[in-house]
Amino acid sequence: MTDYIKPYNNDPFVGHLATPINSSSLTRAYLSQLPIYRRGVSPFLRGLEIGMAHGYFLIGPFVQLGPLRNTDIKYLAGLLSAIGLIVILTLGMLLYGAVSFTNDSQDLESVDGWRQLASGFLLGAVGGAGFAYLLLTLFS
């Protein structure tokens, strides 16, 4: 075990965040397949894919745990609540991109890239939540 845990550059006074877990090739291969890190994909399509997954699973907690969970409109209330949260998340993404990046960068590391990512996220998340709503209403 002493072979794995060593000070960075054999200097115990230098901080380094690499561990055997987060610097392993398996972890790096897994993370490289996530949509945000995938090469050759436009920011809009990255946001669309991320949004579809998030919109699909955001409706469930609002349906099961929301204040209207014992009524006939629990699915509609869950859908509208999820869409409200999605809009708030999209505004947060837009603000983050506006204050963190400039327009002279490349691809996702620019204001325009984050604007595309956020618009794809909004479209995908509303679509994912709508798809989950349709499944819930059809199969319940």
Curated annotation (Swiss-Prot):
Keywords linked to the UniProt accession: Chloroplast, Membrane, Photosynthesis, Photosystem I, Plastid, Thylakoid, Transmembrane, Transmembrane helix
Principal localisation: plastid
Source organism superkingdom: Eukaryota
Compartments reported by the entry: Plastid, Chloroplast thylakoid membrane
Any GO CC annotation of this UniProt entry: photosystem I reaction center
Stored SUPFAM superfamilies: Photosystem I reaction center subunit XI, PsaL
UniProt GO BP: photosynthesis
Membrane disposition: Multi-pass membrane protein
Regions that span the bilayer: 48-68, 79-99, 119-139
Record carries keyword DNA repair: no
PANTHER family reported for this sequence: PHOTOSYSTEM I REACTION CENTER SUBUNIT XI, CHLOROPLASTIC
Stated family: Belongs to the PsaL family.
Entry-linked HAMAP family: PSI_PsaL
Name this polypeptide is given: Photosystem I reaction center subunit XI
Organism: Cyanidioschyzon merolae (strain NIES-3377 / 10D)
Encoding gene (name): psaL
